[in-house]
């Protein structure tokens, strides 16, 4: 809450509202929607960004660890979509829902299996709702980022900066995404300029998934490749 208060102080605004809630709790999200409804506020954009994650081999994963990630990511997304989307439809209001996913929701990944499974579920929830809600002038889009520099998630999953050390090998751009790059893409996708982009999840990973999926791409990381790349 203090971080939200600081942001409002920085932008010197008295017209913004902020709430503290557990997205996995349906009543918490419903209470937010009820408060907005009483103020006659209908969100133009809903960003589904809450997440939870930790590194753990599957055979050492506890039932509670699995359940907590699924509750936050998948059930939290259901709560957000179900409550706000249903209300917009009932009131005949348009809107845009933006889902923040991850590149490994498509590929899967060791050590973050609960998160990968939950994010894949959210991606398909979004795709199904794209078809059901488009007639109501509600558009759904997604962003699938790789590691983001300075984000809370990256700092927790990579306390020793291993991502940065290995970026030269796994990422063609040899760096992590900046928070500004993610926010600017989010602003575009939720704007009227992206009105015809619907049901799509846009990767922003510097080409990392592409590089690591090609059969011979690994050769570009070893000196052997330089002989073929000379002018």
What is the meaning of each model-derived region?
Residues 41-44, 88-102, 135-138, 200:
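Active-site loop of short-chain dehydrogenase/reductase
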Residues 49-54, 207:
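Conserved NAD(P)H cofactor-binding loop of Rossmann-fold oxidoreductase domains
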Residues 57-58, 65-70, 167:
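Substrate-binding pocket helix/loop in short-chain dehydrogenase/reductase
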Residues 61, 108-117, 128, 153, ...:
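Active-site loop-to-helix junction immediately N-terminal to the catalytic Tyr of the SDR YXXXK motif
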Residues 81, 118, 126:
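Active-site helix of classical SDR
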Residues 86, 131-135, 195:
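Alpha-helical segment proximal to the catalytic Tyr-Lys
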Residues 187, 198-231:
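Short C-terminal tail/terminal secondary-structure segment
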């Amino acid at each position: 809450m203090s971080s939200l208060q600081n942001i409002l102080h920085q932008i010197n605004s008295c017209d913004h509202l902020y709430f503290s809630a557990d997205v996995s709790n349906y009543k918490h999200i419903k209470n937010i929607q009820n408060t907005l409804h009483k103020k006659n506020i209908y969100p133009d954009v809903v960003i589904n960004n809450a997440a939870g994650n930790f590194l753990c081999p599957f055979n050492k994963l506890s039932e509670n660890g699995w359940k907590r990630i699924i509750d936050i990511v998948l059930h939290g997304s259901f709560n957000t979509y179900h409550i706000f989307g249903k209300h917009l439809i009932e009131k005949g209001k348009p809107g845009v829902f933006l889902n923040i996913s991850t590149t490994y929701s498509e590929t899967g990944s060791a050590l973050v299996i609960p998160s990968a499974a939950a994010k894949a579920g959210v991606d398909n929830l979004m795709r199904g709702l794209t078809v059901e809600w488009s007639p109501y002038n509600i558009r759904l889009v997604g962003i699938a980022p790789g590691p983001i520099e300075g984000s809370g998630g990256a700092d927790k999953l990579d306390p020793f900066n291993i991502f940065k050390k290995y970026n030269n090998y796994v990422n063609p751009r040899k760096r992590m995404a900046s928070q500004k790059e993610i926010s600017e893409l989010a602003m575009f996708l939720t704007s009227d300029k992206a009105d015809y982009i619907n049901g799509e999840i846009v990767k922003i990973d510097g080409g990392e998934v592409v590089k690591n999926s090609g059969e011979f791409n690994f050769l570009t990381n070893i000196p052997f490749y330089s002989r073929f790349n000379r002018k």
